Amino acid sequence: MSKNPLYTNEIATAHQFVIAHNTDIKLQNFLHDMRFRKDLMHSDRWSLCYDFLKENYPAATDSIVTGLAYYLED
């Protein structure tokens, strides 16, 4: 997980979201693909997470998006 202490709650929320949806193949494939995208800046990673979550999980909050973007950076 990201070492940024400012986003600890967001990262924890995103982690719980991932656990709650652990059987969703689309989410698992997205997470797998994003893990290998080391070329992305945080803002690009955030945008990709936002687009994916809003398309597949319209109720996902910006807190989940932010947490997921930081969660995937490490």
Walk through the language-model features, giving the residues of each.
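Short intrinsically disordered terminal tails
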Residues: 1-6, 70-74
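N-terminal acidic leader/helix
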Residues: 2-30
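Acidic, low-complexity, intrinsically disordered interaction modules
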Residues: 20-73
